[in-house]
């Protein structure tokens, strides 16, 4: 097998992708805890699974190998000590390591098979799953006060964010929100211990222990030499700067990092919710991220005089900055919703800008964003629509739901 991770663009033919099928974690959402768990609504599990299966099969029909996070994680934990270590870390990071409850929960979780263990951790552990006789603390007995020992992880079907493939390596990300912080631990163990990856010594350009957050929805691989990263509600400028320094000092292909500042709000959560690449010279964009004259804050980061310095150049036009770093004389920014103020806001909320390119000029989108899809087709893009009534409730689209592992070079 060649190197197991290889992504040098957003649009190269997709060969291998990582998904997570929605599971019990979705059914453990309740209205009282939606905000805490970063959801706006509760998807209906049978339908969201059906829609996700349709999405996965759509990719397979185009020759894409589909891997599942939950399966890889279970396969990585073959060693008994490794299982115990993983459970300890999950409980600690999930703040379920309070007093004796830690040991009780650990014994409970380790009683399951690997597959069941992973599903249980992802789905959450409720207080009523532990025998009352084993509960020694007041908070354990108060199920109505808070029902979980270990919170569910309903955002896991957005595999884009906890880690991102960059060249032949990846970033394993520190997630900004506590509800998602544990998610990248799965990828850490998969890369270190799954036989598909472990023997290849995959470079980690930035790991989850770095103190400032970065998320994969903000990381876009424009070409072999250039990546774009959103400075957003979820990704900090300090993390981008550290990643740029690490890349410039540890490899020689990526030469520029484009830091793109976007409004810090839930609707514009990551760069890929407002901006994606669909062809060599075509991008989707939500017009609301630009100022009245199309102005934005964009910074081109390049290697400085030594490993700890950067050359930083400020630009105010996204189009001009893209033309500069991609060496293009012309390019097209396709507005989400066709620029209509109502359609644009509605379709961006339902991830009209969150396209997944599976080849140059070929994208997967949600069927509900018909204005944006029509406009993409008018620009010569092949649009493959997938079902979206329940998937879209999590506020993420096809790009959010997929982590490319291998793409062909363009």
Swiss-Prot record:
Name of the molecule in the record: Arginine deiminase
GO molecular function list: arginine deiminase activity
Location(s), subcellular: Cytoplasm
Lineage: Bacteria, Bacillati, Bacillota, Bacilli, Bacillales
NCBIfam families, sorted: arcA, PRK01388.1
Pfam entry (one): ADI
Catalytic reaction(s) noted: L-arginine + H2O = L-citrulline + NH4(+)
Location of the active site: 400 (amidino-cysteine intermediate)
Membrane-crossing segments per the record: none
EC number: 3.5.3.6
């Amino acid at each position: 097998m060649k190197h197991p991770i290889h992504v040098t663009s957003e649009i190269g033919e997709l060969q291998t992708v990582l998904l997570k099928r929605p599971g019990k974690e979705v059914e453990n959402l309740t209205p009282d805890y939606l905000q805490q768990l970063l959801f706006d609504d509760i998807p209906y599990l049978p339908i969201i699974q059906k829609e996700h299966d349709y999405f996965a099969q759509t990719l397979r029909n185009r020759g894409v190998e589909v891997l599942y996070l939950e399966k890889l994680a279970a396969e990585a934990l073959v060693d008994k000590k490794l299982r115990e270590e993983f459970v300890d870390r999950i409980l600690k990071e999930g703040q379920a390591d309070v007093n004796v409850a830690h040991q009780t929960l650990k014994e409970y979780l380790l009683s399951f098979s690997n597959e069941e263990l992973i599903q249980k951790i992802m789905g959450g552990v409720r207080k009523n799953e532990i025998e009352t006789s084993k509960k020694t603390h007041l908070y354990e007995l108060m199920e109505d006060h808070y029902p979980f020992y270990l919170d569910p992880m309903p955002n896991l079907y957005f595999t884009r964010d906890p880690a991102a493939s960059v060249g032949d390596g990846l970033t394993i990300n520190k997630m900004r929100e506590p509800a998602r912080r544990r998610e990248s631990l799965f990828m850490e163990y998969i890369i270190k211990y799954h036989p598909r990856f472990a023997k290849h010594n995959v470079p980690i350009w930035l790991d989850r222990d770095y103190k400032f957050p970065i998320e994969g929805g903000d990381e876009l691989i424009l070409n072999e030499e250039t990546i774009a990263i959103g400075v957003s509600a979820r990704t900090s400028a300090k993390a981008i700067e550290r990643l740029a320094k690490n890349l410039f000092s540890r490899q020689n292909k990526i030469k520029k990092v484009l830091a793109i500042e976007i409004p810090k709000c839930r609707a514009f959560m990551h760069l890929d919710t407002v901006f994606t690449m669909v062809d060599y010279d075509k991008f989707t964009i939500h017009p609301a991220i630009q100022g009245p004259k199309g102005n934005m804050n964009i910074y081109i980061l390049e290697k400085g005089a030594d490993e700890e310095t950067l050359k930083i150049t400020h630009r105010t036009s996204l189009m001009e900055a893209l033309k500069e770093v991609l060496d293009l004389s012309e390019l097209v920014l396709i507005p989400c919703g066709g620029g209509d103020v109502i359609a644009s806001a509605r379709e961006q909320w339902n991830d009209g800008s969150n396209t997944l390119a599976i080849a140059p000029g070929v994208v997967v989108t949600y069927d509900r964003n018909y204005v944006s899809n029509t406009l993409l087709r008018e620009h010569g893009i092949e649009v493959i629509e997938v079902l979206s009534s329940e998937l879209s409730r999590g506020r993420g689209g096809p790009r959010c739901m997929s982590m490319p592992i291998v793409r062909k070079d363009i």
